[in-house]
Amino acid sequence: MSNINLVQLVRDSLFTIGCPPSIITDLDSHSAITISLDSMPAINIALVNEQVMLWANFDAPSDVKLQSSAYNILNLMLMNFSYSINELVELHRSDEYLQLRVVIKDDYVHDGIVFAEILHEFYQRMEILNGVL
């Protein structure tokens, strides 16, 4: 995956989605690219170990809320995400946040149209998790 231009990939996918060029600020491939959203956590995109990773940080729920939502969270985690290297989304927990994460298969990171589909599907998973939490 050495020849990926992450900035161009993200820019092309945002144009495909319909984002006006005026709101796409200078993108930098030396750090995570952040797509800020109005009513949801930001989507972060970066190359990690030469693979494209997407993640979003949700406020960490209480243990009680996490336990009461476990069934719905498990269903979300078991939904197929065909663009991912393991065909699933991952969920990581820390004291501050619950992180929804996916590492994208190399085959899908060279086309802005395909990457727009990935962003859309990841956003749909974010909506599900947000509704559960």
From Swiss-Prot:
Keywords: Chaperone, Plasmid, Virulence
Any Pfam family matching the protein: Invas_SpaK
InterPro entries in UniProt: Invas_SpaK
Gene3D superfamilies associated with the record: 3.30.1460.10
Domain of life: Bacteria
Hydrolase is among the record's keywords: no
This protein's record includes keyword DNA damage: no
Protein purpose: Required for surface presentation of invasion plasmid antigens. Chaperone specialized in the storage of effectors within the bacterial cytoplasm, maintaining them in a secretion-competent state, and allowing their immediate delivery to target cells upon contact of the bacterium with the host cells. Has been shown to chaperone IpaA, IpgB1, OspC3 and probably also OspB.
Family label: Belongs to the SpaK family.
Subunit structure: Homodimer.
Protein name (Swiss-Prot/TrEMBL): Surface presentation of antigens protein SpaK
